[in-house]
Amino acid sequence: MAQTLSFNGRRRVRKFFGKIPEVAEMPNLIEVQKASYDQFLMVDEPKGGRPDEGLNAVFKSVFPITDFSGASMLEFVSYEFEAPKFDVEECRQRDLTYAAPLKVTLRLIVFDIDEDTGAKSIKDIKEQSVYMGDMPLMTNNGTFIVNGTERVIVSQMHRSPGVFFDHDKGKSHSSGKLLFAARVIPYRGSWLDIEFDAKDIVYARIDRRRKLPVTSLLMALGMDGEEILSTFYTKATYERSGDGWRIPFQPEALKNAKVITDMIDADTGEVVVEGGKKLTPRLIRQLVDKGLKALKATDEDLYGNYLAEDIVNYSTGEIYLEAGDEIDEKTLGLILQSGFDEIPVLNIDHVNVGAYIRNTLSADKNQNRQEALFDIYRVMRPGEPPTMDSAEAMFNSLFFDAERYDLSAVGRVKMNMRLDLDAEDTVRTLRKEDILAVVKMLVELRDGKGEIDDIDNLGNRRVRSVGELMENQYRLGLLRMERAIKERMSSIEIDTVMPQDLINAKPAAAAVREFFGSSQLSQFMDQVNPLSEITHKRRLSALGPGGLTRERAGFEVRDVHPTHYGRICPIETPEGPNIGLINSLATFARVNKYGFIESPYRKIIDGKVTTDVIYLSAMEEAKYYVAQANAELDGEGAFTEEFVVCRHSGEVMLAPRDNINLMDVSPKQLVSVAAALIPFLENDDANRALMGSNMQRQAVPLLRAEAPFVGTGMEPIVARDSGAAIAARRGGVVDQVDATRIVIRATEDLDAGKSGVDIYRLQKFQRSNQNTCVNQRPLVSVGDAISKGDIIADGPSTDLGDLALGRNALVAFMPWNGYNYEDSILMSERIVSDDVFTSIHIEEFEVMARDTKLGPEEITRDIPNVSEEALKNLDEAGIVYIGAEVQPGDILVGKITPKGESPMTPEEKLLRAIFGEKASDVRDTSMRMPPGTFGTIVEVRVFNRHGVEKDERAMAIEREEIERLAKDRDDEQAILDRNVYGRLIDMLRGHVSIAGPKGFKKGVELSNAVVSEYPRSQWWMFAVEDEKAQSELEALRGQYDESKSRLEQRFMDKVEKVQRGDEMPPGVMKMVKVFVAVKRKIQPGDKMAGRHGNKGVVSRIVPVEDMPFLEDGTHVDICLNPLGVPSRMNVGQILETHLAWACAGMGKKIGEMLEEYRKTMDISELRSELTEIYASEANDEVQRFDDDSLVKLAEEAKRGVSIATPVFDGAHEPDVAAMLKKAGLHESGQSVLYDGRTGEPFDRKVTVGYMYMIKLNHLVDDKIHARSIGPYSLVTQQPLGGKAQFGGQRFGEMEVWALEAYGAAYTLQEMLTVKSDDVAGRTKVYEAIVRGDDTFEAGIPESFNVLVKEMRSLGLSVELENSKIENQSEDQLPDAAE
């Protein structure tokens, strides 16, 4: 672990509690995505051409394309990518896809065909590079930008191609009999199932259609009945001897059989085994030793056996009996009559060998190949009459045609392993031997030999990553294109065309676009914080095209499997319907070239654990004994214990140390990134750990990030690999720093072609996909020396290069007036006033001005009927200023839309004619702030269509952008000049000059003073005697000029892009995007959580003075309910609280020492304290710190010492107690607390300490919602639902029951009519309220009319009778007294 600390590692050192040294480097966390897509695209062609994989393989599998007559052929030569038109940032801003144009070189060959002989000769060859659409590129962070939004392609887990043997677990048949089945799954093509039925007949099914006897399939492969039987059974021959038969003694077949009648030796006639005995292996061995060769058999023994060959009269050719026929008295008589004295029978004893194939053959109605082929044809294409040719072609195309059927290399490898075959992995179709081997293996399973497969074993499931998914998609696109090309080749004059005229790349481009835009696996990136990004990229989904569906997935697929160890995290998976179907890759896992997940292990050689690391997939691991990473070793690397806990083929066991071959690399290799961030994970219940790892992904980046006191050591890795924090690309010295960029002058890796300057642009207050704020802050200052990989800027949720999702808050576990009932959280006002949990959210609003039928819409400040007050935030172009504070209903962008002309009165016409054109009617369609949002405008972007005149605002934004680019160019130029002229003066110094600028004397020795007399631009005029030096000068000059022109060119390109108009959707003239930053303070109703699945909702914010306080007067920040811990068994949170309390205590001590040092300037005490705190082999760096670094470290540590307790290898209880003791605190971790309202101490001591709390992205502001009137559904006329639709509150069935129970008839009527869908009634109520009246009448709800209409549509005549009732006169009514 002792590595040299990076630039920020010197400011924050974590005390490391892990005891197990890590021998393997953790792979880059987004390698899964990047490696897969790079392998697919292969942008840079390697020397010797591209290998046959990825995009190259796709082209090669579809090309060459020949036309129907064979007169011409289109071949694929190679492909290349051009530079993308826009970079990542520009694509984000302009809503474009980040992609590179794909150019494919194709060769069209035209043949001359001799009409008589049919011989071909080449007539013409044309080569051309053809544009084949744009291929999306992956950004450095493993994402794609599609239409301006970041997306991630999730890897998919699916069943590996190959052959699988299984049984129905006795479910299909009432007797509970196990029905075995085999299934051959190709990568693409038809599935082949071979299965038993309840009567033990073997059937085959193709593509899950109607089943056929398996013997029909074998016949279609060209076998006859006798050949089938000889393949599956051995034969024994009964020879006639005297009045009985002799049969060869077969020891193997008789093992453990029971003898019914006496066994008699055919040669000697003696009884060797008496009837009723069991043939044990020992007894059989004795018989073999005695030399028993043959046994005596009677006619009865022959009955029930099956013939192995046809019994044929060779002279006449007459077949008496066929192979597979059963022998009984009648048939035996027939055989003996015909003079046969040898009878070959099948070795079937119905115990070790069953007669399944023989029974299937006799039950099969097809007798030969033609009938079998016809039968298969009828199953596959019902209703078409078969011919021999069509049936044969169809059968061949099913499994034996490489175009239609592909096992893939994986499938072939898996099949070879399972069936013990040795075909090359280039043989991608089925062979006859494969099908026979599958049937044989299935029959052996039925006979009780061998094991069925476990489909949930990770050896039988593989991962399809981006590259492979994309490859399949692109292949589909090319195949669609192929049909079109063939038709075009046949229909046009082939001699005159170029390859470009044949190709329409639309289908291929559409396939790519469709995949990225609407595939189930192409997902909108979860970008709440850096951890959620990383987790999303490492996700494995079993859903998606070609995968499972939620409804069909049973319990087994979702369950944790022993092979998940070190490959898939057993903890992190969603709660709910997707549980177990969506998983996360373990920290050290990687995906191999076949798509299986591999985990790393240390090799053990001669009983010593080495540092050699090998990666194994689940299949390979099964044969090894693997020790845990925490097994105790001595100094030599040998196990100290005689017996070691280890894993072998899915079982955990104790094994002697000499048997152990491998050892885990690290204790955290079994969990995923999110779970590895939970300290004391080993003390938490798994269900709560699952919630903890899921909730960390929802943590909102706070205004000020703060790294946890108690971490796990994973924090810097996540921050670095997610790309949130910026790492230096190469070593150098910081030249300039401001909030938006860092300029570093490189001091290493200085190639001639590269610029010597790295400019890092920081993202300032950008919006993430989830509306959280992405903001980067520089960590370096001018003059700092940086090495490659150092973190130079923090991103969202990172603090000094550590992931920082929340804040350390002082918590007390105690009830407080019922405000922490049911996991509620009580909070101090200090947290609100100090902005501890304040976050910034950025909302985007966009307005489009379209060209309508009545005329163009216009973005303007001139809006009808709007007061000047409402326009105060708008500039002259009608767009809001940056920095304006806006609230609900404020205008962001003024826009007017023409509305239809109203007919004019004659007077108006006259006035118009006199005074000229008055503006035609327009209505106000301005963009306004939605209800409930307050904020500040942070950015405005204006986009114009090509050729539309730009307004003032657009011009101003453009000028600003160009100034920024010019500044970049000038800074880079200045550093270049400084470097080059510095080198130039060094080269000239000490040389004698033979030429120079005007007025220079020859032959003078050059020095700094001499050269500096002239302006820099004239220094190039100096020439020196030494030829070598002179040529170096010229080389430097060339290099300098080239760099300068390259810089200028780059600047001009960017400026041209800025000034060019933008691509717009059809009909849009202009678009404005406004970004509003909203500051969200914590408030009651917000959801918060710790890292251990302990979540709760803020219930009340209490004044600081009312919160409980410690003896020194410190008030606690948060009160949590102690009852939330025992039942949930997440004790990790208590250990974390104690340990962080100790950290803060130590920090306080360090702070005091720092004060002392500032007074006395004696650093020795501070140095000894820090060295003692960080004393361990992992932190020996601290001893070598200079005074400045030490003070910086102390400054950082005085808030609280940072420590790392890795999962499964962290601090134990004694360590926590020792830390508390060292900090001068009570070892129980409990303190006396005083009531803030009375000042009295509480009755008992309370657990107080720091807990790392995170604010989750479930904020009450986003959820609270109110409506009086608003939009209504078109059909039912009821209010819409949900905040997004500005909907109403649902009043459902159970709520109706509640009002009925109370007898609240009028309230109920009001709910069901005027508050919902009584259209006339609700308008009247509104009018009445406006008038100040409070009477209303309910009418007929619209839903009643809908019901009537539905009944009518069912053919029922339904009339509403109430209009027909006549008013009865008073006297006709019956009197009550009667």
From Swiss-Prot:
Gene Ontology CC, one term: DNA-directed RNA polymerase complex
Reactions catalysed: RNA(n) + a ribonucleoside 5'-triphosphate = RNA(n+1) + diphosphate
UniProt key word Transferase: yes
Cited CDD domains: RNA_pol_B_RPB2 (cd00653)
GO biological process: DNA-templated transcription
Top EC group: transferase
Gene3D superfamilies: 2.40.50.100, 2.40.50.150, 3.90.1100.10, DNA-directed RNA polymerase, beta subunit, external 1 domain, DNA-directed RNA polymerase, subunit 2, domain 6, RNA polymerase alpha subunit dimerisation domain, RNA polymerase Rpb2, domain 2
Pfam hit, one: RNA_pol_Rpb2_2
Keyword Repeat: no
EC nos: 2.7.7.6
Family statement: Belongs to the RNA polymerase beta chain family.
Alphabetized NCBIfam families for the sequence: PRK00405.1 (NF001616), rpoB (TIGR02013)
Reported function: DNA-dependent RNA polymerase catalyzes the transcription of DNA into RNA using the four ribonucleoside triphosphates as substrates.
Quaternary structure, from the entry: The RNAP catalytic core consists of 2 alpha, 1 beta, 1 beta' and 1 omega subunit. When a sigma factor is associated with the core the holoenzyme is formed, which can initiate transcription.
Name of this protein: DNA-directed RNA polymerase subunit beta
Species of provenance: Agrobacterium fabrum (strain C58 / ATCC 33970)
Annotated gene: rpoB
